């Protein structure tokens, strides 16, 4: 196994604007890291720099304790799996998986051994003589992964490999990728815009925004303790409810637009007089009643999801989304009374967006 290290790596196309801000990342031997973020955030560019397909403007890349910053892709000990499979249509599954080893001059016996082992792991044994056009999307993606496995790389690089698959097949392939990593234990760097893939596959998630790593942490950490307003809004479905306002001068209240107020706790009071953003996840609201007090949510729409429901409504000028038990189905125009437990409230700096 081998580790991967990015040391203050940056990228600029014109020498002025940095599309990747200096970024440092240590990936342990056998670790599975997922880079997630919206389109244009720089995640694929960063992956291509690790692969050697893009030049690094500054900084260094280390694989298996070797500096590979200027090395050709073929010499880095990496194998890449792409979104579009990149299979040769005129070759069989077996030939596609073996081709990279063949052009490297590996012996036929060893090639056959590696292809058979990869086919066994990926359950492609009975498909080795077929052409790509005879395979389903999931089978083609397994062939692409098999072609990477036979190389026995130090690091796997995945560039949105499940994007072309339908929803049901994506779920199946996520499970297969988890099982594959548990079996091979190869260091992996995976790019996706899909937060479900990120949260289910990763041992650690790197959330990227405009070329910056906003947060690096376990899936639980980035969900339960987002490092910034951006992470809070990007990770989670639905996104965290974010309310703009300020802490009162005496620190005792959170003052929102429209004259709405919420109590603060002792920790919040150190931010007295400052603009802040308050966040709460949809599942952390507690149903209350008018007699018990709380905040009134005027219902707009209800999304019935099966296991639970999402209530969309307004509290004054604030729009909120609340997750409800499946049997709770308020109608449009009705009022829900809610309690916001202080222990589940998140505070973000109103200027920087960073967690307070």
Segment roles from a protein language model:
Residues 5, 26, 62, 337-339:
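ABC ATPase nucleotide-binding domain
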Residues 59-67:
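Conserved ABC transporter NBD signature motif
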Residues 51:
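Helix-to-loop junction immediately C-terminal to a conserved catalytic motif
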Residues 73-230:
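ABC ATPase nucleotide-binding domains
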Residues 57-60, 110, 210, 345:
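Conserved coupling/switch loops of ABC nucleotide-binding domains, chiefly the family-specific signature
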Residues 36-38:
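The feature captures the beta-strand-to-loop junction immediately N-terminal to the Walker
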Residues 238-241, 249-356:
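Non-catalytic connector elements of ABC transporters
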């Amino acid at each position: 196994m081998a580790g991967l290290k990015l040391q203050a790596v940056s990228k600029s196309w014109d020498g002025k604007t940095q599309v990747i801000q200096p970024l440092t990342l240590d990936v342990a031997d056998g670790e599975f890291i997922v880079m997630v973020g919206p389109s244009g955030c720089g995640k694929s560019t960063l992956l291509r720099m690790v692969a050697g397909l893009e030049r690094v403007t500054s900084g260094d890349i280390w694989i298996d304790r070797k500096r590979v910053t200027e090395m050709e892709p073929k010499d880095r000990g990496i194998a890449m799996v792409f979104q579009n499979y990149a299979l040769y249509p005129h070759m069989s599954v077996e030939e596609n998986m073996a081709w990279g080893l063949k052009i490297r001059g590996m012996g036929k016996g060893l090639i056959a051994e590696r292809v058979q082992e990869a086919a066994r792991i990926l359950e492609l044994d009975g498909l080795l003589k077929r052409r790509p056009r005879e395979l389903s999307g999931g089978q083609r993606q397994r062939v692409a992964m098999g072609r990477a496995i036979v190389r026995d790389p130090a690091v796997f690089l995945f560039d949105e490999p499940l994007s072309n698959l339908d929803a049901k097949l994506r779920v199946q392939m996520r499970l297969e990728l988890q099982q594959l990593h548990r079996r091979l234990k190869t260091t992996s760097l995976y790019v996706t815009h899909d937060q479900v893939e990120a949260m289910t596959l990763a041992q650690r998630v790197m959330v990227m925004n405009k070329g910056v790593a906003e947060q690096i942490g376990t899936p639980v950490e980035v969900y339960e303790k987002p490092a910034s307003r951006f992470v809070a809004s990007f990770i989670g479905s639905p996104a965290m409810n974010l309310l703009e306002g300020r802490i009162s001068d005496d620190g005792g209240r959170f003052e929102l637009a429209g004259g709405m107020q919420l109590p603060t706790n002792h920790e919040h009071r150190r931010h007295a007089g400052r603009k802040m953003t308050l966040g709460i996840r949809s599942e952390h609201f507690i149903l209350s009643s008018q007699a018990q007090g709380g905040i009134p949510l005027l219902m707009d729409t209800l999304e019935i999801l099966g296991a639970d429901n999402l209530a969309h409504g307004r509290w004054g000028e604030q729009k909120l989304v609340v997750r409800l038990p499946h049997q709770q189905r308020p109608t449009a125009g009705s009022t829900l009374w809610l309690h916001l437990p202080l222990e589940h409230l998140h505070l973000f700096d109103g200027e920087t967006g960073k967690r307070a």
